[in-house]
Curated annotation (Swiss-Prot):
MF (Gene Ontology): carbohydrate binding; metal ion binding
The protein's name: Regenerating islet-derived protein 3-alpha
SUPFAM superfamilies: C-type lectin-like
InterPro entries: C-type_lectin-like (IPR001304), C-type_lectin-like/link_sf (IPR016186), C-type_lectin/snaclec_domain (IPR050111), C-type_lectin_CS (IPR018378), CTDL_fold (IPR016187)
Residue ranges of every copy of the C-type lectin domain listed in the record: 47-172
Biological-process GO terms, alphabetical: acute-phase response; negative regulation of keratinocyte differentiation; positive regulation of keratinocyte proliferation; positive regulation of wound healing
Predominant location: secreted
Species of the source: Mus musculus (Mouse)
Region described as Sufficient to activate EXTL3: spans on this chain: 103-118
Keyword annotations: Acute phase, Antimicrobial, Disulfide bond, Inflammatory response, Lectin, Metal-binding, Secreted, Signal, Zinc
């Protein structure tokens, strides 16, 4: 039998070797994993894991969403954070001088039947957690049931607009 002291030394040496091997293999694995970068087609801009494009040809809200759906997982843009709102605003500002609104993927399929504007949703089914209304969407002033970005807010805030109106729009899709 090996003395207790020798057995402890061998155990520590074996453990140290195993830890070294796992650490080296882990470093090699990390080097092989490419950093996530979104490469978008010409005319589109990347933000996080999506591609975005401002389409200047005015369409109704429904026609605009159909145009966006021609791309993989494409829809009118859903804006899920303040950072994304700023990105979309920078994409639009200075390029739509003749329009007071542009389409985004918000719509109210209940046509205002839900109290307090509770029927609004994104066309791509993203969860509507981030809210950035330029006023009250349930007011009786406009009563549109499709969402837009408003020029008066620097294209940062949302308004409601008549779905049959024709406006430029922003598409968002995964590449």
């Amino acid at each position: 039998m090996l003395p207790h002291l020798v057995l402890n030394s061998i155990s520590w040496m074996l453990l140290s070797c195993l830890l070294f091997v796992f650490q080296v293999q882990g470093e090699d694995f990390q080097k092989e994993v490419p950093s996530p970068r979104t490469s978008c087609p010409m005319g589109y801009k990347a933000y996080r894991s999506h591609c975005y494009a401002l389409v200047m040809t005015p369409k109704s809200w429904f026609q605009a969403d159909l145009v966006c759906q021609k791309r993989p997982s494409g829809h009118l843009v859903s804006i899920l954070s303040g950072g994304e709102a700023s990105f979309v605003s920078s994409l639009v500002n200075g390029r739509v001088d003749n329009y007071q609104d542009i389409w985004i993927g918000l719509h109210d399929p209940t046509m205002g039947q839900q109290p307090n504007g509770g029927g609004w949703e994104w066309s791509n089914s993203d969860v509507l957690n981030y809210l950035n209304w330029d006023g009250d969407p349930s007011s009786t002033v406009n009563r549109g049931h499709c969402g837009s970005l408003t020029a008066s807010s620097g294209f940062l805030k949302w308004g409601d607009y008549y779905c049959d109106g024709t406006l430029p729009f922003v598409c968002k899709f995964k590449q």
